[in-house]
Every structure is written in C-alpha cells, then in structure tokens.
Amino acid sequence: MVVQLDQIHFFIFHEVLKIFKTMPQLFKTSKKIDELVINTIRFLSVDMVERAKSGHPGMPLGASHIVYLLYDRIMKYNPKNPNWFNRDRFILSAGHGSAMLYAAFYMFGFDLTLEDLKAFRQLNSKTPGHPEYGLTPGVEVTTGNLGQGFGNAVGMAMAEKFLSHYFNREGYPVIDHYTYVLVSDGDLMEGVSYEAASLAGHFKLNKLIAIWDNNHITIDGDTKLTWTEDVLKRFEALGWEVYHLEDGYNLDLLEETILKAKESDKPTFISVRTHIGYGTPLQDTPEVHGKPMGKEIVEETKKKFGWPLEEFYVPEEALNYTRRKVEEGKALEEEWNKLYAEYREKYPDLAQTLEKALNKEWSLDWLEKVEEFKEDMPTRKASGKVLNVMADYIPTMIGGSADLSESVNTVLKKYGDFEADTPTGRNVHYGVREHAMGTILNGMAYHGGILPYGGTFLIFSEYMRPAIRTAALANLQVIFVYSHDSIGLGEDGPTHQPVEQLWSLRSIPNLWVVRPADANEVKYAWEIALKRKNGPTAIILTRQKVKTIDRSKYASPEGVRKGAYVIADTEGKPDVVIIATGSEVQVALGAKEILEQKGIKTRVVNMACCELFEEQPEEYKREVLPPEVTKRVAVEAGRDTGWYKYVGSDGLVISLNEFGKSAPGSVLFEYYGFTPENVANKVIEKWFS
C-alpha cells in the first residue's frame, strides 16, 4: 500500500492532538486565565443586558464556564469560517442565554465586535434577543422556544451519522464531528426534549453530548414546584450515558467527563450543578433570570469578583489568550482541506455527490422519469410514487413519518431504515413523536448535506407547529408532507378532519403550502419544494381517491409551477372566476360545466400555492385573476379565513367554518355543499338570479 506524505502528516497531527486531549495535564491552562476569560464573558453579558434594559443575566453568570470550556478546550472550529463543514456544532438550546454566547463569540474571534455586543437586542443588530441562524456568525440554530434546540441537536447528530457512514472511506474521515447542546431545566420539562432524547438513545447517537445547566430555578421559583422526577434516571432509561457533576464549576472535571463522553457508544447527558446569577446577591433566585439586575447590584457583584466597574471591560490578557483560536481554527481547517483534496482525487464521484448536497444542488432529472398517471388515485399515493423515483437521483434525501409511513406514503422502498446499526438507511421511523420529528428535520437542514422530509396527517401538524414556524424563521429547506387533508378522510371524524389547518399554515411567514389537485400535479409540488432553498414547504395531500384530470381537455399540470393557473377557461371575458385548491378543483370544474350550460362564462383557477402565486409578476397575476372580473368564488374544504383577499369583500367563499362529522368522505362533501351542483347554485343565487 502506498501512503501519501500528506496522509502521514494528517495522521501524525491528529494522533498528537488525540494524545493532548487524553492527557489533560499536558493541555491545561492556568486557573487564573480560565477565571479571567470566564469573568470577562460573564460581565460582558451583564453589561449587555444592562445597556439593553432587557435580557437574561442569570444564565450567563451561572453557565459561562461551560461555554468557555467547550470553545477553549473541547471543540474544533474556525472562528473566521464558522461554516466550515467539519466543525463541531454547539447549540444553545436555552436561547435566553444569548448574551453569553455572543460574548464568547467575540472573545474567541468570530465576526462580532464590541459595538455589536453593545447593540444587544437593538433593531437590526447582529445580536438579537435570542440566537437567530444566518444572522450572527457562529450561531448554529435559531433557539428560544425551549426544547427546540435539543431536538435540532438530535437532527444534527443523525445527519453526521448518516453522512459519515455514507461518504467516509478508510483513511479519509472527511465527516467526523460532534454536536454539543446546552440545555436548561425548561428545555428538559418540554415534551419535545423527551421525544427527541428517546430517539437519540434508540439510534445510539454517540457523537451527541448534552450538557444540562442544572440550576434548579425557573421563572416561577425552585424547580421543586413542578418537577420532582429523577431526570438522570430518565435519560439512563432512554439509553444515554449519564453523568452528574455536583461540583459544577470544576473545569478539569467537566473536561474529563466530556472526553469520556466522546469515547462512549451512546449519546451522553452531563448534569452540571450550577447556580443562576452566580456570585450576585440574587444568586439562586428567579429574580435574576429575565431582567437587568440594576446598577447597584451590578457594581456590588463586580466588586465581589474584583472586576473593574467600567462597562464592557475586556482585559487584554484574556483577549490575547482566546484569540489564539483564530490561528488554531485556521490550521484545523487547512489540515482538513488537505485531507479532503486527497479524498476528492481518490473518490471523485463521492466528492461530487457530497459537494452538490452541501450546495443544495438537488437533481431534477427525476422529473422526466415520473410516469404520467392515468388512473384515479389519492394524491398521497402519487406522492409515494414520485418520492421513490426522486430517491434514485438524490442520495442524501432522508425521509420518514410519525408512525404513518404507509398512510402518508413516505417510504423509500429500496433504501432501508435509519437505525443504530444501519446508519445509511434513508427511512426514519419517528414513532408517534410529531414535534420531535419537526425539530429533527430542522436539525438535519441546519447541519447541511441532507434534504429532509417528514410526514403525518394534516391535523397533526398542530403537534409540530413550533418546529414549522422555526423552519420558516430560519429559512430552512425542510419539506413537510401532510396527508388526510380535509373532511374527505371520512369516518375518523372531526378529531382527525382538518378545518382550520390550511389557512393556519398559510399564515406562517415564509412557509409555502402546496395543495395539488390530482396525481399529475404532485410531481410539480415536489419540484417546487426542491427548488425552494430558502424556506420550508408543506405539501398537502388527500386520503381519498381523486379523479385524474383529463389534460387533453384542461390545462397542463405544469401550471402549478406558478402557484396558480387557469386550468379551465371560457371564450372571451369570463363572467365569474372560481378559485379552488386540491380535491375541490374537481368540484369547481364540474360547477363550470353547469354554469356554462346556463350561459354563464366561467373560468376556473387552480390556486395550488398562494405563496408562489404571489411571487409571480403582477402582469401574470392580473392575467389569471383579471381585476375587472369582480364576481369571484373560492372553493376549499376548510376555513374561509384568507380567501377574501382573492374574491373581494363581495365575493363568495364556499368553505367549512365548523368541525366535521364522522361519515364517509363522499357523504360529507355532499352534506357540506362541496358538489358541482351546490357551487353552481350558489353562484347563480348570488349574481345571476
């Protein structure tokens, strides 16, 4: 075997680094410099909160040493290229501690200035109240809603596990990094953290390390008010390696524990006993959690620590020490670049696949391979067929469902299950854990290299709404697949029948909602989702069979690419325009036939995606919905909430503004008036009687 020189250098570098990390006594800093940097982070955070007259000083005072240790001794990263792909990831799930994170970023050489810290929580600053992905260099995820970051961390660790096993080859560990997440008491009270932790243990995500800022305090008081379970035993039962550090401020012990965790074959949960508002008169009380302490207490605390009263004081010694990480990070990335260059030369096809995935260059070659559907079928079934064609062209597309894979048709039949022992499987079984599924999908998207999708019934989108909203806020390319989209699902009744969900989802900024009308429109819904790289897409599908529209009679399904299109027109200027979505397009087409027979010129517009339609040029929008045609109707088996924007205040909306009933879907459509005859009659009654 011929070993390249650069390989030898890389091997030696990492072996030496490994020795240093497993022999802490060779790698230790003085306690003096540790304390100096930690206190700098603490008091920068306090000063940020005081200047903003808003924020959370308690966590930075109590937990800055944890963040310091990770960035100083544990993690590999490049402050000047925080997007280096093989970096370790750190997630502050307890996003209210953001001041601490920004202060650490400043100290360790990320692209933040002291002026940025002074602009904490101010309009258009780089230091918002809670971390926002894409806004602040170094922030890995958008956090604030407690529990979300924990689930994101699980998703990141899953992405690393899949990608490393898919792409790495012997001697070329091009994907090899850890995910660290700092969680609060509140994070662990949230149900989503339990859901996500259960999956992490099941999948044996050994490169996931969660650190609990165990300070015993919530806003309402001591955690004993509401929380008396044994959290450590809970995590142990979930399959985690568990440690508790009663001496939570012993840096060497914490470092030693993290290094042990890195050798485990399971995810690790480290409980660190801390004190909120450490060192202040308000220590261990809720009063120090979420508001400025005030000048008097700040000065008293600084004096106690022997700290200058000057605001935003940064000792030169501390800054010089932490800024060494800039050169260290640069060297780490350069070494990796050398390794990757060799990998690229030896495995060009794999490298090209990885690079396309990282750049979100998802193949669209599958479009022409999807069959033209002739038979009538549920759109969920068509979606499953489309997915299984797509999967051959997008090797890092990973999907799953919340225990509904056969119902929502999310299974990639040739590609196996993602499990602890089969990490290159592409079907994730989330169990009945919708919220965790949403946060994990987001985590995969944050990580990069994965095209994630997840499915459940539309009604259960409610269980994952915080994750959907965060995906939209963070501009993540995540695809949510929701079937059983109306009363058309039938006998399961109103507990399962969506009514308010369509407009509820459409109300989320930056979320696109696509509801195809038949099987042949489904592939274009997926195309929209793949092309949309700066935000999430929800694809809405039927349980019930819908007719496959005769495209020799009606417009091509390609019109979906513009969000809305004229699927059926009339001669000359229309008297009335009927707008419909999904399965109700069939109803609108039937109503058109009745109205035309009565001499009423009718246009039918298929509004598959309102958000995409709004992106079109004004000229196109006026062509589809001529301003001079004011007799407009919207037909959708859900709430009428947003349709008046399109039909006008004098328009007609045929909708469902009450909960459904348990009965066959076809019976319910007739009962609630979603029939061609009823729509036609309503139009005639309003304008032509």
Curated annotation (Swiss-Prot):
Listed Pfam families: Transket_pyr (PF02779), Transketolase_C_1 (PF22613), Transketolase_N (PF00456)
Molecular function GO terms recorded: metal ion binding; transketolase activity
InterPro entries assigned to the protein according to its UniProt record, in alphabetical order: THDP-binding, Transketo_C/PFOR_II, Transketolase-like_C_2, Transketolase-like_Pyr-bd, Transketolase_bac-like, Transketolase_CS, Transketolase_fam, Transketolase_N
Keyword Ribosomal protein (UniProt): no
Entry annotation: catalytic residues: E434
Metal-binding among keywords: yes
Protein EC: 2.2.1.1
Reaction(s) the record says it catalyses: D-sedoheptulose 7-phosphate + D-glyceraldehyde 3-phosphate = aldehydo-D-ribose 5-phosphate + D-xylulose 5-phosphate
Positions contributing to Mg(2+) binding: D185, N215, I217
Functional note: Catalyzes the transfer of a two-carbon ketol group from a ketose donor to an aldose acceptor, via a covalent intermediate with the cofactor thiamine pyrophosphate.
Family membership noted in the UniProt record: Belongs to the transketolase family.
Protein name: Transketolase
Gene that this sequence comes from: tkt
